[in-house]
Structures are given as structure tokens and as C-alpha cells.
Amino acid sequence: MLDVFITSRVRRKIVVVYAKYPDFHTHVRGLAKLIKEDPGNIQRELKRLEKVGFLQSEKQGNSRTYFTNKQFPIFKELQSMVIKSQQ
């Protein structure tokens, strides 16, 4: 169902992880291992999702950690869609 609204496979996987686990914090390489995608593609999509406000990030040493912005205007709706599509 989400593939109709989110056409990028990598972006869809990222949204599913962060909507399903809103307290999840990780860096690009950790997420790449989790969803089995190329870190370069993940980095690009994380930046896009941060730009629209779905994700936030903070710099920790040489890496950047990404986490869900629970104040994102449609976060609850998106989370509900993800949970329903997983059932």
C-alpha cells in the first residue's frame, strides 16, 4: 500500500523503520545494514526526509545520527499507515 504513495523503495524502507520505531536513533551505516541498501542512496533519502521535517539529526563526532521528528504534522497518520500495511 505504501508503494503507491512513496515511490522510492529506499525512502519507503526508511519511513517504515522510523514510523514503526519512533525512538530509533541511528547513523547511515547502521541503517544500511538494517535495511540492506547502499549507504549512498540512504544518505540522499535521509537528507530529503530531514528537509521536509520527517526526520531530525544531530552530529556526533564524525557521524550524523538520524531520528524521527514526532512533531511532524502527519506523523501519526503516516505511522498508522505503516502499521496497517504491515498487518
Across the structure, where does each feature detected by a protein language model lie?
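Helix-turn-helix DNA-binding helix
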Residues: 42-43
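Short, hydrophobic-biased segments on the C-terminal half of alpha helices
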Residues: 46-47
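Conserved segment of winged-helix/HTH DNA-binding domains
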Residues: 65-87
